[in-house]
Amino acid sequence: MPWKIYKKRHLTSFQVIILGFAGVILFGALILMLPISSVQGIITPFHKALFTSTSAVCVTGLAVVDTGSYWSAFGQTVIMFLIQIGGLGVITTATAVFILSGRKISIMQRSTMQNAISAPKVGGIVRLMSFILKGTLLIELIGALFMIPVFCHDFGLRGIWMSIFHSVSAFCNAGFDLLGTKWHPFVSLTSYAVNPVINIVIMLLIIIGGIGFFTWEDIYLHKFHFKHYHMQSKVILTTTLCLILLPAVFFFFQDYGNLSGIHRLLAALFQAVTPRTAGFNTTDLSMLTGASKAMMILLMLIGGSPSSTAGGMKTTTFALLLLNVLATFQSCDDVTAFGRRIDASVIKNATTIAMMYFILFFAGGMTISVYEGLPLSSCLFEAASAVGTVGLTLGITPKLHILSQIILIILMYLGRVGGLTLIYAVFSDKNKRKARLPLDKIIVG
């Protein structure tokens, strides 16, 4: 358990978080290697099991083997649990075990829990964790119940399992699906492109899972009284709405000319929702225009919101960057939102995170392109999908060399643990300067 590591090694809470994710990934890979995990009853090569486990725990959805046709029922169940652990977070899952066992949680453990979900304070953290766990199970159950009639109609009783799996995968923004076959692998939700129930339920699960647990709490406590929400929830909801509607309009006019009416609108909406770390697709992405692929790369890098099941640099990071630019245009000293001033250190963190994701995205895509001899645009798409923990692909991931797949594994891992968590885990408070250096200016622009 992460708590034991914390006590014995005197690690910081951030180091516990990143080691916890690594431990679960390795354990999942070893389980997936077992013959019982595959349909053919063979030992799965370690690199394939590791890639799948990393993709599941990091709630990405990229795959080197088709989930529906390669993995057995046992293997699929393991993947679903890895997705659930990854979506909630390793520390949150460990907390659930502690709560269910009735064990007392120490102040150090509460502090780690606070950092794991970026809670503003330690007080009430156990109650909040309980709220998150109950809310997660309830939402996933409701999502599964809505999809059961559709999947049972198409797959019989197996449709119940498929509904549960896809509900967990959608809520956790993972993008794994069981719809592929030996003859038609990696199809995602393309066979349900015009099914309103599947489209709407999957979209709602993705959005709810991606807005963050603290936004849930605001909505739960204050219902639809937007003015009573915390500023973070206001920024998240406003940014999320803009990042759904504006790209949806773009996709509506840019693509899907072969569809008409409600089906075209549904496809455009789904394509606007899924790039922000979900990874499902209802159309062949390779057929999209270059402009649409560029838009999807941007959405994949932005991702979901803080303290959510989603990855990416986060909606708040993107919003703060825009607000900072707006403040500069207006010659304002302070960055403001909804009548509140935002601390300069938060803006600095947002800039750092955005730069980290951009560097990882570009370096990863460039390296894969050079090594594989593939078009840079396609490799950048896969890199953005990995570091944003999205799972959308142009179809090249299963064909990549092992070294390129290892690069994607690293990108998925770094994208899931988060920029600030990684920074704080590597650079402790001991590295802070005890004295401030003289101030000077430098010309920019």
Regions found by a protein language model. Name each.
Residues 1-445:
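Membrane-proximal intracellular helices of multi-pass ion channels
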